Each structure stands twice: as C-alpha cells, then as structure tokens.
Amino acid sequence: AGGRRSNVCALLHVTAAPIGREWWERWVGERVGACALSVRAFVTNARGFPVLPKETQAMVRDMFRKNIQIMLTDWNGGPDGLARETIAPGDVAGDEGRVDVDSAHPMRLYWEYLVYLFRGVEPASEQALAEAPYRDYLQAPLQPLMDNLESVTYETFEKDASKYIQYEEAVRCALLDLVREGDEGSVMVVGAGRGPLVRASLRASERANRNIKVYAVEKNPNAVVTLQHLVAKEGWGDRVQIFPGDMRTCAADVRVDVLVSELLGSFGDNELSPECLDGAQRFLKPTGVSVPQSYESFVAPIAAAKLHDAVVSYKDLKSIETPYVVKFHRVHHIAEPKSVWEFEHPNNAARIDNERYARVEWSSEELGSASSTLHGFAAYFDATLYDGPAGCVRCSIHPHNHTLGPTGELMFSWFPMFFPIQTPVHIDRRGDLPTKIEFYIWRRVDAHKMWYEWTIAKPVQGHIHNPNGRSYWIGL
C-alpha cells in the first residue's frame, strides 16, 4: 500500500541466523515496534542453559533501552508462520519482576534469561532521565537576535558544567599566553546572559594568576538586571563592568585581550555566531583572540522514520523545509559525518563574506552493507575554543569526540540538528551496483536574515529545500 503509515510498525523476526551489528543498527532508524525472538536464536552454554550469542545479547539490550517489545516464540518444529507459543517479559512479570510462569512452562528458562539481560541494563543516569522527554522531539532553533531568552532557557544552559569547564580552561590558556604576570588583562563577554561566562573568566584569571577586568555585554534587559544583582552580590564592582545593548552596536570604548562568547548553535553557525562576532571583533586589541577561535560544521546521512513522520504530520511545506534541534534516539547513521565548512575569528578579511556552499559525497564503500532509508541529515559542530602555547581546548558535539563533563557525562547544552528531506530515499545495498549519496547545502545571507538551502543529487535528484529562505530563516 502507498502513502505514509506512521501508525504501522515493523515486527522483526529473529531466528537462528547470527545477528550482525550493522543489520540491527539499520533497523534502529525504522518503525520497529516489536521483535519476535525465536528460541532457535539461543545456544546452550556449558551448564546446559539457553543463552544468546553476544551480538544478539547486545541487540536485545538495545531494544530494552529503546522500549521495543520483545516476544519469545516457540515454533515447535512447525512451518514458518504464526508462532504456536509466545511469551513476552511484560506479560508475565509479577511484583518486583517476579516470574509468575509455571515452572514447567517449556519457555521458562528462555524467559528467565531475558529477565536476566533486562536487569543487567544499566540504569538511566540523571542526565538521561532529564533528556528523555526530548528524545526524537522536534524543536525549532532559537532566534537569538530577534527574541530574548527566557529564564528557564538560561537555567538549562547554565546546568551544563562541562561547557563552562572548557570555556574556563580556554580563557586561562589565553591569559597565560597574552598577559604577562603582574600586568592587568582584559576580557569581554559578549552575550553574557546571566553571567556564567563572567564567572568562568574570573575563575580562569585566578587559576592563571593574572589580574583582569571583565566587560559584559548583554542585550536582554531582564538578563542585565540579573547580571547587576550578581555583580553586587559577589562584590565584583571593581572587576566587572556591564554594557547593556547589542554587541554589534554597543558603544563601549574598550579594547580587550580576549573576546568570549557562547553564540554557537548545534550546527556551529546556525545561531548567527559569525555575524555577531564580526560585529564585536572591533573590541579586540590587535593581538587579541576570540574564544572560540574557530568552529567546523558536519553533516551525516541518517535513517530517522520517527522524526520524518513528525515532520510530515504538520502537512505543510514550511515543516519539511525547516531544520530542527533534536535529541536523537531512534536514529541510524547511514555513514560517518563529513565536514561542510568552517568559520574563524577574528575575521580579518578585507571583505567579510559569511555565505557558504558545500558538496558532500559518501561513496558506496562508506555506506556499509545494510540497505536503509534516507530520511535526512544530522548536523553537528566541532569548535576550537583556544589553541596556543599554553594549550588547546575544544568543545564538540561530533559523535566521535563529544565533549565530556567531569564525571564522564556528555555535554548537553546542544542537541544535534536534523535537516529533513521531503521524500525518503531507499539506499539499496543488496546488489553489486555502486550506490552513493551526494548532498548539497548552502548558507545564504542578506541584509535581514540568514538561512540554509539543501538538496540531494544522488542516488536520486531531489528538489532544493527552503529556496530564498521561503520557509525558515534566522533574523539579523
């Protein structure tokens, strides 16, 4: 049957065939609602009990984490078709997970083994529990210049210790390299919000044994009031000066050693960091540095049926031509992320041009052996906060070098972005014919807004999404 069927889910049937990791990962991004796990998928261990091979164990644990129903099936030697007996862990568990199955039930040992695997799944961390409501939930990116952030948004950002640890270390290294001991250095925080980077900069100066003056620039009048209270409460009156206003037009007559900002978005430049920092770099001394110094944007093709279903459920063109911020959960990366472009600060070009264009290709060899469905592209950033003699400090949500916090948790200030495509594309890996994915993306800017346009050219030609910013844009 044709059409989209978001209310129809797949049932995976796992028999005796060995389960490869790539095969299972291919299904993570699809509409899988349940798994029929045949007793023939089990092997007997040295003690005579049924167990699953390691690859299948890993798959089952992942299904538990992703809330996929698992049903044991017993074919009793019958032909393939409907199982004669089925049993699901959720159907027969009593209080505290006790088993209420008759001890003589022929599938009891298999069921108990699944219970054992379920209990072995590590409990969700506090961070994972906090992020759970955002899993595969589409969020529109911020409009940082047009809108003032709400207090709850600031609070969420400020909870991410890992980000501010990285920023503090970057400022410390910059002060060591730029300010001689005994001299007074200067730091300007643009987009200071409620003050977390001001606090991080002051801590960095203490660790570097450098005296500094901090200038805080903030356009949100509510955040300015909070900053003023913070400065008074902490007794920073002689060390911190506040300039209310837009960093691009602020009249502060100062020149600083370090220009600090947390204007990065999930795709690096999507919250107008280039445009904002170009306007603020006039505050830097000729020898001054920006924190961050540079940031690189990446994209990767993904299978994400749940996300695509959510996008098309809005039934309008705007929704399919909008990139979203998403905490990925039921998503499969068809291939590895690749770089699209980079921005560096300060930008000393005679004519500053923040428009970008990239063509990215994934070859047949890079797509793996499992067929999949392309629903869109994941987007990430990797930033160099500071790189100098005193050290190199990075901040990243790239899957392979995601910044970690002090206890090993992932930095959570940014979720990845999702660029949907209007029509999903089947990536067929069954035959010998070569298959490749070719993706084009543009960053466009005019006097009033910034927007992205994107399309695919292979394996099929798609149309350009969001031409001239007709559906989505970020206001300047």
Model features per residue range: what roles?
Residues R194:
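Conserved SAM/SAH-binding loop
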